[in-house]
Amino acid sequence: MRKYSPLMVQGTTSDAGKTVLVAGLCRLLANKGIQVAPFKPQNMALNSAVTEDGGEIGRAQALQADAARVKPHVHMNPILLKPNTDIGAQVIVQGKAIETMDAWGFHDYKKLAMPYVLESFSYLSNNYECVVIEGAGSPAEINLRENDIANMGFAEAADVPVIIVADIDRGGVFAHLYGTLALLSESEQARVKGFVINRFRGDISLLVPGLEWLEEKTGKPVLGVIPYLHGLNLEAEDAIKSEQLDKGKFIVKVPVVTRISNHTDFDPLRLHPEIDLQFIGKGDSLSGADFIILPGSKSVQADLEYIKSQGWDKDIERHLRYGGKVMGICGGYQMLGEHLADPLGIEGVPCRVKGLGYLSISTELQKQKQLTLVEGTLALPNQNAVKVKGYEIHAGVSTNLGKEHIPISIHTKDAMRYDGTINDENSIFGTYLHGVFDEPEAFEAILTWAGLEKCQAINMHDIQEEAIERIAKSMEDSLDLSLIWPDVFEKNKAY
């Protein structure tokens, strides 16, 4: 197996474009026939993905694996932090949750985490021809440098070259790049191979004097300037993506709870031309919706109380009274039930609380998570059964207390199992499946059930593929990658 130099992409800030840049590089290398894997030593996100072997990684790394045309693997994101309070997060190591830690606890744990990070990187290096690595936040955060495993601490330990990307759309790009480099140690500066400027709009000739100044002051080349790509429909890692090209007439409202998880579930709705998807924040109302969906949550009991504090439970009651439909996904499904019990204190203090009481289910949180990729059939009332795909990430086990309709049949190696509940009035539907809207047939079935006439789904896989290819083409045109991989790419004018 031929080997190519690994490369680490670090950023001057969060949301500088590291995730997209790594995805684009993975696709460019894959298009050249190179077996490439993405890698992020440490990620913090509430959006996670499930691997085939039942592990949990950041959704960004699953997206990057798709860009590389390989299957997601737990070693692509060995340390995942999922915040469940303002000061604490569940720590997931090589796909498995170990415990919840506060900031100081994890700071001390990083010394123990580095061997897992290096083990995962070694696995990828041995099994792929090239590894493209994503940093986290900025490498110049002085307070986080001790025992760092996410940025230069990893780069030094693994001896990998680095490029630094900055978002010019935010302003201050030269201060960001020059200042970030200046705050690094001499050995760290030496492994920086160059800079990339992201999201540029306008005439690049006006930028050239600044680029020349930066190269002269730092002695580092600018590898290129990537233009701002409008309408790039990729999953957002952290912030909820609410941009819509067109707003349809069918209004879907999603209450934004404090620990909302896997909000990428709603991307097929956001991109659909007949749907007006609205994320409803603090102080706003759910009134006026055609369809209300309660999202997943990392802290179900706390977010249930938040829903009540905002008066959204009253909005839901009124919505149902006038014939509206309501759906709950994962944590949202649990909230719609009779009770939520947490005897082990998984989410904090052991307790048992009342749910919204719309579905005859009772949920108990357990230490062992359910982490599964799912395929099966969805049979909503008065509709033909259709194909459904998705994934489960939850610690709760829900027991059906009545004889309400269970709409989803899941195919497993051993036997059939079942998921979800629909109430007798056919107005409320709950499921544990994240990604339930991604399969076109399931999308059409659920939205038809919810009241959208003549519903026709969009193909999320095709939309993602188009976006990844756009990124790759833009980077191929904009960057001089011969400075990193001279045996793969021809020399290109950087600017």
Curated annotation (Swiss-Prot):
One of its GO terms (molecular function) is catalytic activity. One of its GO terms (biological process) is cobalamin biosynthetic process. PANTHER family: COBYRIC ACID SYNTHASE, DETHIOBIOTIN SYNTHETASE. Residues 249-442 form the GATase cobBQ-type domain. Catalyzes amidations at positions B, D, E, and G on adenosylcobyrinic A,C-diamide. NH(2) groups are provided by glutamine, and one molecule of ATP is hydrogenolyzed for each amidation. Pathway: Cofactor biosynthesis; adenosylcobalamin biosynthesis. The keyword Zinc does not apply. The gene is cobQ. This is Cobyric acid synthase. Belongs to the CobB/CobQ family. CobQ subfamily. HAMAP family: CobQ. SUPFAM superfamilies: Class I glutamine amidotransferase-like, P-loop containing nucleoside triphosphate hydrolases. It comes from Aliivibrio fischeri (strain ATCC 700601 / ES114) (Vibrio fischeri). It holds the Pfam family CbiA. It comes from the Bacteria. The active site is at residues 330, 434. PROSITE patterns: GATASE_COBBQ. Keywords: Cobalamin biosynthesis, Glutamine amidotransferase.
